[in-house]
């Protein structure tokens, strides 16, 4: 947005980020510190610049001064300009396989949302739910976690949000804030994070972590291998979060009458599955097959 910097809420953090970076870059040399082995460790000019860049990026990200991608590119440019790292090394990292994997997972999420597959799956799941509020909690959280198996958790949260609004409007037609509403939306955010650790498609951190792991150890972890270890933890976290939310945000009412009928009506309103939706399913299925092929054929 061309006018965004006229907003003090963006301008001040923008200046603060630059000031934090320059303050650390221009900081006088600090005394050496001593590591546990007794060796003296000094903070170089590149080290100070790296710390300043960390603060700059963090401030800009937290306050949404610039689009996330623009800030990300700025990190690489600043590293080159201030000679924090060699230009070739700094900019080549943008072509790392983990970066492209993250981009791919975001595109899968965008395809699901754009074609309406996310809504179709969500409405279908709701038609199978009980109208008891604790079960609605469980169903909404399980649905959120399930969707994060195939698409980025941020895309899932954006897709599920309108659906939860429908549920809450049926629970409280006046729109008044309720404990149930707080639990529904807070729990959705938490379980999106919990479910996203199960597969590499759920969040960027998994792919990045595996990239670091391969760089440090030389070993690779397959798509199914990480799911094998993370699935029990992810499922347990979702279950514990459901219990916690049910206790802390105990609903004022015991049920939401007509929820199943409303979900059935919304699902019917989508009509039969379209060619675009079928095509998306086939393409995503083919992508996942390629990603997991090495688990079955190690020679690949």
Language model features by range: what are they?
Residues 3-32, 114-117, 173-190, 194-209, ...:
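Juxtamembrane and boundary regions of transmembrane helices in multi-pass small-molecule transporters
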Residues 11-21, 46-84, 96-107, 159-163, ...:
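Hydrophobic mid-bilayer segments of alpha-helices in multi-pass membrane transport proteins
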Residues 23-28, 58-63, 146-149, 271-272, ...:
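Hydrophobic alpha-helical transmembrane segments
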Residues 25-43, 59, 63-65, 88-89, ...:
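Short, hydrophobic transmembrane alpha-helix segments
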Residues 27, 62-63, 81-82, 129, ...:
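Helix-loop junctions at the membrane-solvent interface of multi-pass transporters
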Residues 35-39, 56, 69-175:
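Membrane-embedded alpha-helical segments and adjacent helix-loop junctions characteristic
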Residues 57-67, 143-152, 189-201:
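Transmembrane alpha-helix interface/packing and boundary motifs in multi-pass membrane proteins
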């Amino acid at each position: 947005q061309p006018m965004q910097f006229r907003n003090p809420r963006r301008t001040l953090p923008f200046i603060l980020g630059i000031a934090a970076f320059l303050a650390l870059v221009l900081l006088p040399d600090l005394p050496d510190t001593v590591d546990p082995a007794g060796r003296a460790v000094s903070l170089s000019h590149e080290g100070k610049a790296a710390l300043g860049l960390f603060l700059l990026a963090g401030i800009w990200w937290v306050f949404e001064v610039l689009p996330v991608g623009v800030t990300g590119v700025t990190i690489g440019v600043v590293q080159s300009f201030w000679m924090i790292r060699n230009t070739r090394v700094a900019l080549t990292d943008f072509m790392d396989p983990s970066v492209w994997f993250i981009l791919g997972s975001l595109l899968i999420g965008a395809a699901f949302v754009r074609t309406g597959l996310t809504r179709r799956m969500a409405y279908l799941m709701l038609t199978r739910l009980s109208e008891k509020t604790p079960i609605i909690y469980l169903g909404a959280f399980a649905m959120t976690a399930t969707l994060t198996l195939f698409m980025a958790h941020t895309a899932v949260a954006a897709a599920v949000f309108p659906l939860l609004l429908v549920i809450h409007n049926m629970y409280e037609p006046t729109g008044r804030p309720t404990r149930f509403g707080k639990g529904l939306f807070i729990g959705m955010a938490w379980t999106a994070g919990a479910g996203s650790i199960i597969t590499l498609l759920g969040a960027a951190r998994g792919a990045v972590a595996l990239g670091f792991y391969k760089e440090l150890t030389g070993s690779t972890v397959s798509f199914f291998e990480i799911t094998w270890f993370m699935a029990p933890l992810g499922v347990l976290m979702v279950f514990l979060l459901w219990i916690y939310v049910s206790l802390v945000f105990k609903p004022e009412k015991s049920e939401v009458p007509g929820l199943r009928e409303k979900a059935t009506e919304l699902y019917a309103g989508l009509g039969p599955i379209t060619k675009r939706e079928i095509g998306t399913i086939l393409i995503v299925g083919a992508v996942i097959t390629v990603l997991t092929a090495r688990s079955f054929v190690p020679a690949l």
